[in-house]
Amino acid sequence: MKKFFCLSIFICGLLLSSCSSSSIAGSILSAKEGSETADGRMIDTEASKITGNSDSTATSTPTPEPTLTMTAAPTLTQTPTPTPSLTPSPTSTPTAPDLVSFSYSDLHQGVQPVAYIEDPCDYLISRWDEDKSAPGTIVVPIMFHSVAKPGREITDSTTISVAYLDYFMERAKTLGFSTITTEELIGFLESNEKIPERSMILILDDRRPGVIEEYFMPYLEENDWTLTLAWPTTDATSNSLWERMESLAETGYLDVQSHGHDHIYIQDYTPLEEIEEEVYQPVEVIQSHFGTTPRALIWPGGNFNQISVQLAQEAGFKLGFTVFSRGPVMYNWIPLGPQETAMGAPLLVLPRFWSTAADAALEKALQIGEEARVAAEILKAEELAYIASYCQPQDGD
């Protein structure tokens, strides 16, 4: 009985061993044939490629079974999720809105106001500085030539009568205008330096000492006004004329500026050396005879081109005047036609009214100045808010 029991145990052990081997072999075979991915594709383990789930059975060349090295699965430690906290983001500078520019509908066709202050903060801070010129302040540049004596017939478009000059001067006073110098105009146009709200710059072209002495000087002395001279410095000037002009300049009523050297009308075909002489030579001559450096170039005949404007900048001129009656000028507001605008230097191609319509120029300027003042008041709150938002100094400035 004992022998029979031992034999039974031995037979059962053999059967169990056979089942276990078959099961392991089946598992290995199944792994070799492939496994199915989550998207229904079959992975061919031996061929190391992905094939589509197909009803056909691929025939492959048996390869030696790889030796599988069992490694322990890594233990995954869950990292706790940190509690989100609010961290300040770097302060970014918001985009500043576009500023509204003053426009005037009654300018001549093709004439547009040009702004020239690049930094809007510089412009607005100067515009609303109480120690500077108020919005609506205007400057009227006026060009004079000959003044005809009583009884003389006027046959050209640049000469005015004594009677008209007298009328204009009285009208200017009645309207509250006064004169400014070139330096004052530069300060106003560049940084809105304070000048009279109704200003004019009277410019007498060419070499006319008699006109100065007989017709202008009485008004200059009476009103403490200044006359700007557009003076050609030609080599043909006599010593006696120089002495006469130097004596007049000593009165303090004259503001001598350049009108070229030989009064050449600059054209695109004008030789470069002639343009250079027109621009550079007067600087030295005026310094020699009047002890001042000219800061304005009144273009001879009103002619200029890109080369002459560039040379004027290099020579140190801050202003230039044409013969175009475009309108009065204001801070950061210069009315220009296409020819002047193309130069890219608004302050070197400023407009001038002709003396034959000088009184009308003053009336028009007052209208423009008043509209500009009203427009500025409407925009004041918005522009002050702009300054507060975008023009404050940053840390480290």
Task: Pin down the residues of each PLM region.
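Hydrophobic helical h-region of N-terminal Sec-dependent signal peptides
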Residues: 9-14
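C-terminal motif of bacterial Sec signal peptides marking the signal peptidase cleavage site
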Residues: 16-18
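Ser/Thr-rich, Proline-interspersed low-complexity disordered segments
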Residues: 22-127
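N-terminal pro-sequences and low-complexity stem/linker regions of secreted or lumenal proteins
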Residues: 162-163, 228-235
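A structural motif
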Residues: 245-262, 275-279, 286
